[in-house]
UniProtKB/Swiss-Prot annotation:
Keyword vocabulary terms for this entry: Chromosome, DNA-binding, Glycoprotein, Isopeptide bond, Nucleosome core, Nucleus, Ubl conjugation
Keyword Cell cycle: no
Cross-link Glycyl lysine isopeptide (Lys-Gly) (interchain with G-Cter in ubiquitin): where in chain: 119
Similarity remark: Belongs to the histone H2B family.
Localization of this protein: Nucleus; Chromosome
Name the record gives this protein: Histone H2B
Organism: Anopheles gambiae (African malaria mosquito)
Listed GO CC annotations: nucleosome; nucleus
């Protein structure tokens, strides 16, 4: 049979145990979730400054951007492989965009992409 202790002694030993376990525990770091949310928000504010976006809509937009990114990357990779190249260049990306996006949307995407690449190379 276990030895009996007074109520005060039991409480004290319980407190001591809690303090030890709290100090031994390390703080868990919050894992980072990569997202396009800040960029989507910046574009939204450029186009419609007075419009907001819900977290669910932001999640959908983030999924959309990830999906399009994966499709373009896969198509560009395929094009590089067909042409026996080991590097994906802006040319492969541009061709992939032309193949994936319909008509006018592809034209606008290519012109915006070209503008972004030109801006990037001139700033170097």
């Amino acid at each position: 049979m276990a030895p009996k202790t007074s109520g005060k002694a039991a409480k004290k030993s319980g407190k001591a145990q809690k303090n030890i376990s709290k100090s031994d525990k390390k703080k868990k770091r919050k894992t980072r979730k990569e997202s396009y949310a800040i960029y989507i928000y910046k574009v939204l504010k450029q186009v419609h400054p007075d419009t907001g976006i819900s977290s669910k809509a932001m999640s959908i937009m983030n999924s959309f951007v990830n999906d399009i990114f994966e499709r373009i990357a896969a198509e560009a990779s395929r094009l590089a492989h067909y042409n026996k190249r080991s590097t994906i260049t802006s040319r492969e990306i541009q061709t992939a965009v032309r193949l994936l996006l319909p008509g006018e949307l592809a034209k606008h995407a290519v012109s915006e992409g070209t503008k972004a690449v030109t801006k990037y190379t001139s700033s170097k």
